[in-house]
Amino acid sequence: GSEIDLSAYATVGGVKSVYQWYLIDRATGKRTKATMQAVSGKDGAFIFEGKPGEYYKCEITNNNYRDWCMETPRIKVARGSADYSPADIAGLKKLAADNPNITQLKEFVDSKGWERENWNSYQDNIRTDWSTGEVGRLTHLYIWFEWNSTDTNSQLDLSAFTELRHFECENHMNISKLDVSKNTKLEHLHIYSKNLSSIDLSKCPELRYFRFGTNRTLEGRYQDTKLAALNLTGCSKLTELYLEHSPLASLDISSFKLLSRLEIEYCPNLKLQGFDKVTSLTYLALPHTEQFADLVKNLPASIRQLYLQDTEYELPSSQVGKNLESLGLPGYVESLDLAQYPNLSNLNADGSLLRYSTVKNYRQI
């Protein structure tokens, strides 16, 4: 219902400007043409309408200047304090009550931090995002603590968040169980806890991203965990899988036809089944592992990024090497012929014995 006044740009050089509104998809950034009611008798002024939580922007062009274009910032339809799902609010309050030693959670609840809808604010340690519509449902939840924090998350009840699509809580987790059976719309899960012995994701058919461990390859040794059972049955949409610091013994990935990124680190007991059935894989990282020598010898030609730091694996065949764009070298490598890697644009030699003087057919990459 607010008036958006852009009338200052209604005429440029005697030529009327054209205003085009767009609805912005928050996840993809895709724009869809939209219409705003014009204010009568005031060119370039509009009555702003939309569903709570939606984002819009207006593009202004003028034929007097062919390449001239202006855009407003993204404009968000505000939501009232009463327009959030009571069930989701109760779930956030329970999360804080279950972990009374986590001051940041308590402060978030006491201040009604969800009203900030601060998903894109990377300065905040607790961030949320909500669905569009008259009653907002919690779709994204991120909990992060400073590296030197003494807080630990000991209980994690996500059952109230039935519309949750993205959950992330990596550090200072001390949970021993995780129940996501009610989170059937979950697409992105990043979690880590040394006491978590099993994870069942079979009720999450929309899952596309799962990470158990740290955010970055070679970020450093966390404590080894108890994760010995992982059920990914039915997660056929999975595209990214990251596992580390786990005693997990076996994992069948044959049903993940869409899997494009796989990272395994510090999992000494893990054996993979069905690797040859994963035909979409382009990214493979196996640092700090010893058991995948046969796998590395038989990599698919689809691999574009390969990271083998702190391993003793053989370098890939020329058939695979010619397609590589990024390569992390095993520690023993003393020399490298770049002629075998014509498409390589990134080379990580940290921790290896490679020197500039031992690189053959050197070129700028």
Task: Give names to the regions the model predicted.
Residues 180, 186, 207, 227, ...:
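Intrinsically disordered, low-complexity proline-rich tandem-repeat tracts
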Residues 1-166, 184, 203-205, 236, ...:
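N-terminal capping/linker segments that flank leucine-rich repeat
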